């Protein structure tokens, strides 16, 4: 999909454009779209005509946790993908869109990671059978949701490759809702197979420039920005945004100069904004595979060197997993070296218990392939295995 030396232009704010065409507040957007197919076709054709190289299909909330019970997940996604294809033709890329389910993962909520993976697999199976050009995992607020979605893609796309974009949304703290900083999110997403990474919603383009500066030294994949049209404000009972298309275009140039390769718009960005982006003719920064060592928990990353303070632990079959997790969380160190000397049952219980605690990043030590597979599946960060 990537064009040599040129940015890829995504679409803009589909939801707000649909509201202009009659989508009421509080209804299921996917169900409304199926009942009003001309509305989504109008919006997506407008973005294509404005210069979008790739358009997100309206499958954002088309999962079993958000859809009404009478709608079949597979059929709903298939129909929404078909409407998108009819709107944009075959010369524009179509992306299957995945978003948060609205339910929190355990222990903040009741949903398990295994259940979330199965929820996403239902959508992705429809993407696979339809033949989408790429998949986007967007507006993610919990890095574990990102990991589950990427694992679901791996489970469905075992015999062919489909590019996967990941974009997260940040709070005013500069971190995801569950505390993951942008660099850690990038490293975890890359480790689990993301083909591009970045940000959507959250803020205007001006606030995304320093975020790119943080990521570029460590990014081995293209970087995405899909910002809002500045800050929202209420005017005459309506939400309007602070940046017009020309000011947005000015900042998009800065985004590209600071490392963005794939650019679109989120809240408040109409086809006019996408047209402004498409008028830009500026080269993108070359992407290279970065070589460095790191260990990440879900909230922090350590780049080991001579000054790194390590704590050494051993996990055995005699270990009580939950208490052990708290021992690790209390360790006075930068990172943990954990020798695995237990069976799969104890390791699984330990890894599941990590979701209850915030531990320093862990470097796992085992040459057992079955145990390595469990670590890849259940670890809450992205940690190397020795």
Task: Label every PLM stretch briefly.
Residues 1-386:
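Domain-level signal for soluble alpha/beta catalytic cores
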């Amino acid at each position: 999909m990537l064009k040599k030396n040129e940015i890829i232009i995504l679409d803009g704010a589909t939801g707000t454009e649909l509201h202009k065409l009659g989508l009421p507040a509080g209804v299921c957007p996917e169900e409304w779209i199926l009942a009003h197919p001309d509305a989504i076709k109008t919006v997506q054709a407008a973005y294509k005509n404005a210069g979008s190289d790739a358009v997100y299909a309206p499958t954002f909330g088309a999962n079993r946790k958000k859809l009404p019970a009478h709608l079949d997940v597979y059929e709903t996604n298939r129909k929404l993908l078909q409407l998108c294809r009819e709107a944009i033709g075959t010369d524009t890329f179509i992306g299957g869109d995945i978003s948060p389910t609205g339910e929190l993962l355990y222990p903040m909520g009741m949903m398990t990671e295994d259940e979330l993976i199965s929820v996403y697999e239902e959508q992705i199976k429809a993407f696979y059978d339809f033949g989408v050009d790429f998949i986007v995992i967007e507006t993610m607020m919990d890095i574990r949701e990102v990991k589950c979605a990427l694992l679901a893609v791996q489970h469905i796309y075992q015999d062919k490759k489909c590019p996967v974009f990941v974009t997260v949304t940040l709070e005013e703290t500069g971190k995801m809702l569950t505390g993951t900083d942008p660099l850690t999110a990038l490293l975890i997403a890359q480790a689990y197979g993301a083909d591009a990474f970045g940000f959507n919603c959250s803020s205007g383009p001006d606030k995304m420039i320093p975020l790119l500066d943080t990521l570029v030294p460590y990014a081995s994949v293209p970087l995405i920005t899909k910002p809002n049209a500045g800050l929202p404000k209420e005017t005459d009972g309506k939400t309007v945004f602070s940046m017009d298309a020309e000011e947005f275009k000015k900042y998009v140039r800065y985004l590209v100069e600071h490392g963005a390769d794939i650019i679109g718009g989120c809240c408040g960005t109409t086809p006019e904004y996408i047209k402004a982006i498409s008028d830009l003719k500026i080269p993108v920064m070359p992407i290279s595979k970065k070589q460095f060592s790191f260990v990440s928990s879900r909230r922090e990353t350590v780049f080991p060197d001579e000054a790194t303070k390590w704590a050494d632990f051993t996990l055995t079959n005699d270990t009580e997993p939950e208490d052990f997790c708290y021992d690790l969380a209390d360790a006075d160190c930068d990172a943990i070296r954990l020798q695995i000397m237990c069976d799969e049952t104890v390791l699984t219980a330990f890894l599941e218990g990590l979701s209850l605690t915030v531990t320093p990043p862990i470097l796992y030590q085992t040459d057992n392939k079955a145990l390595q597979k469990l670590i890849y599946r259940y670890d809450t960060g992205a940690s190397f295995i020795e």
